[in-house]
A protein has these predicted regions:
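Internal, conserved structured core segments that host functional sites
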Residues: 113-115, 119-169, 173, 194-195
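Conserved nucleotide- and phosphate/pyrophosphate-binding catalytic cores
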Residues: 157, 163-353
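N-terminal Rossmann-like or analogous alpha/beta NTP/dinucleotide-binding catalytic cores
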Residues: 2-139, 257, 296-298, 302, ...
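Extreme N-terminus of proteins, especially the signal/transit-peptide cleavage junction
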Residues: 1-3, 346-347
Length: 353
């Protein structure tokens, strides 16, 4: 069986470091591993419209921003198909068929949907498209026969929902769809990077992000304002590492060579944590170190992004070509699904059989 990846992002804003450590970095590694036959990376504009229907211009303007971020982190269009979701209409038809296999009560139990409904204040007025987007995601995944979906842990309920749809479809109509597996980041700190304000999720809508395209002075300003341990009032006070975003970011980004270059009095992160926990280490010092680490990590990404910004017609062509390949693949899957449901009425005069 072919090994195929499907992953993507909603174009509601530029991508941030939470995206980077949660999935983008892993996508580049997988892309270059040679272990996968096909890789599809989707700019999920249709899904973004489920809670931005009154502002489609916001979605439209961010399609190129997300594409630029992909290319900046190292996604290679020669190895991965970058495409726009709404340019593959077969996904909508697949979603429509899958809706008949899922109950309202099952959608209501999805913890990711429940959390996002609360965050977006949709409790009393949930758009139907938003409520059913886990079904749309299942269509996205199955249309490309994805075997692997690299994603953060917050997407695990979505993958479970998708696997249920695949199972039911295969039982009711015959073996047609491929059951996917989620691939989580190996570094626990990367599973879900908190916002700079200490909130559980880094989110564009909460304004607590460090963007991949941020300028150096903006990154420094955000890091120096980061939430830390509220009980660590004086340098000599013992500090808490658990739940401290500065150390969570260091877990995700720092490497031994960073200590040798920027903070040679410590050999590694464990030594730095131990000093902070016993007292005598101030927040400003660890924030300055984090700033140095993140500047080193993000500078080459920012440079590549600026280079691609000078080649926008080429970026559009990459999206066109990727979308054409994606539509061809999705059309083949849709044909198989229609055949399994026996609704391919005009193929070989099937309506007469």
């Amino acid at each position: 069986m072919k090994q195929i990846i499907l992953t993507g992002d909603r174009p509601t804003g530029r991508l941030h470091v939470g995206h980077y450590v949660g999935s983008l970095k892993e996508r580049v590694r997988l892309q270059n591993s040679g272990k996968f036959d096909e890789i599809y990376i989707m700019i999920a504009d249709a899904q973004a419209l489920t809670d931005n229907a009154d502002n489609p211009e916001k979605v439209r303007q961010n399609i190129l921003q997300v594409a630029l971020d992909y290319l900046a982190v190292g996604i290679d269009p020669a190895k991965a198909h970058i495409f726009i979701q709404s340019m593959v209409p077969e996904l909508t038809e697949l979603s429509f068929y899958y809706m008949n296999l899922v109950t309202v009560s099952r959608l209501q139990r999805n913890p990711t949907v429940k959390a996002e409904i609360q965050q977006k204040n949709f409790e009393t007025s949930i758009p139907v498209g938003f409520f059913t987007y886990p079904i749309s995601q299942a269509a996205d995944i199955t249309a490309f026969r994805a075997t692997t979906v690299p994603a953060g842990e917050d997407q695990m309920p979505m993958l479970e929902q998708c696997r249920e749809i695949v199972h039911k479809c295969n039982v009711v109509y015959g073996e047609t769809l491929t059951e996917p597996e989620i691939l989580l980041p190996s570094n626990h700190a990367c599973l879900r990077l908190p916002g700079i304000d200490g909130k559980a999720k880094m989110s564009k809508s909460l304004g607590n992000c460090i963007y991949l395209s941020d300028e150096p002075e903006d990154i420094k300003k955000k890091i120096m304002s980061m939430y830390t341990d509220p009980g660590h009032l004086r340098v000599q006070d013992p500090g808490k590492v658990e739940g401290n975003p500065v150390f969570t970011y260091l877990d995700a980004f720092s490497r031994p060579e960073h200590f040798a270059e920027f903070l040679p009095e410590y050999q590694n992160l464990d030594e730095l944590k131990a000093h902070y926990q016993r007292g005598g280490l101030g927040d400003v010092k660890i924030k300055k170190f984090l700033n140095a680490v993140m500047q080193a990590e993000l500078e080459p990404i920012r440079t590549r992004r600026k280079e691609w910004e000078q080649r926008l017609p080429e970026v559009v062509e990459i999206l066109k070509e990727g979308s054409a390949v994606a539509e061809q693949t999705a059309a083949a899957t849709l044909a198989d699904v229609r055949k399994s449901m026996r609704i391919d009425y005009f193929t070989d005069n099937n309506l007469l059989k």
